[in-house]
Swiss-Prot record:
One of its GO terms (biological process) is proteolysis. This is Ubiquitin carboxyl-terminal hydrolase 12A. The gene is usp12a. It comes from Danio rerio (Zebrafish). Zn(2+) binds at C187, C190, C234, C237. Keywords: Hydrolase, Metal-binding, Protease, Thiol protease, Ubl conjugation pathway, Zinc. GO terms for cellular component: cytoplasm; cytosol; nucleus; plasma membrane. SUPFAM superfamilies: Cysteine proteinases. Residues 157-169 have a biased composition (Polar residues).
Amino acid sequence: MEILMTVSKFASFCTMGANASALEKEIGSEQFPVNEHYFGLVNFGNTCYCNSVLQALYFCRPFREKILAYRSQPRRKENLLTCLADLFHSIANQKRKVGVIPPKKFITRLRKENELFDNYMQQDAHEFLNYLLNTIADLLQEERKQDKQNGKLANGTLDSQNNNSTPPSTTWVHEIFQGTLTNETRCLTCETISSKDEDFLDLSVDVEQNTSITHCLRGFSNTETLCSEYKYYCEECRSKQEAHKRMRVKKLPMILALHLKRFKYMEQLQRYTKLSYRVVFPLELRLFNTSGDATNPERLYDLVAVVVHCGSGPNRGHYIAIVKSHDFWLLFDDDIVEKIDAQAIEEFYGLTSEISKNSESGYILFYQSRD
C-alpha cells in the first residue's frame, strides 16, 4: 500500500512539473513578470476552500505587500499570521517561477486554532475568509497592545507619537478591506432621520437570476418600509411609527470583497441548496451608490480575483480561484495553475437554468480601487 501511495505521489508531482513547465512556456520568458511567482497549493484533504482564498489574497497586492513586510519584522510566537507570512514569503522567494508548494504549516495551525476547520470536510470559503481577516486583525491589535506595554515598561512612558496615531482598533487589515455602511431610518411622521454607522470587511449581497453585481449592490441599498409589527420606535415622537429604512455606503474600501449569497435554506428540502443564478461581474466596477456625506462618493474598481464554487451545494463541490496578474489571468485549482483568456471569466457567471444544478459560479469577488 505504501509503495502504491509513493508511486501515486511521484506521478502526481511529475504531472505538476509538466503543468508548471507548460505554464512557463505559455507565458514566455520575455513576458513573464519580474519578481512574480505562480505556485499551486497542495490539497490536504478538502482544503480547496482555503487554497482558493489564499491565492486570491496573494494577488491582492496591498495585502500581499503588508504580509511580506510583516514577515521581515523580528520573529514572534507562531500563530496563524506568522504561518501565512511564512507561506507568502516562501512563494515570493522561490528560485523557480512556477511550481507547487504544500501549505502544511498553515493548514496545521488553522486546524489547531479553530475546530470548525479541524476536519477533512468541505468548508465554506467565505467563512474562512472572514475568520482569517478577523484573526489577523485581532493578532495585530494584540501585538500593538503588547508593544505599547513593553514600551511603557522600558521607557517609563508611552511613545507620544504612537499614542496619537491611528485608533487602537485600526490595523492594516482595516486600511485595506474595511468600508463603512450607514443605516438610515426616517420617521414618516416627524421626518427625523437617525443614522448608525457599521463597518465591514466584506459585503454579502443577495443574488437574483440573470442580473449583474451592480444590480445586486443596488438592491442591497433599496429602501424598506417598516410598518405593522415592524414599526420603528422614534425618539422624537416617543412612540412606534412607520418609517423608511435603507443602507448606504459611507466609506468605500481600498479592496472591496463581495460575497454572493449563493447558498439558501430551502424549507421543502430541509437543507441548503445552491443558487447557480447567472450574475455578471464586470472587470471594471464604478460605485456611485453612496450616502450624502460619503468620504469618496465615486470610486473605480478593477476585478483582481474571484473565488469560484464548483458544484451544487455548500458541503460538497470544489473551490478554485481566478486571479489577475499584471496583464493576464490565471486559474488556480489547488496544485494546478493555468493561464486563461479574460473572456473565459464569463464561464463563471453562473447558469440561466436550474438553481441547484452543478455550476462553476463566482462566489467571492475581489475588486481593487484604482486610487
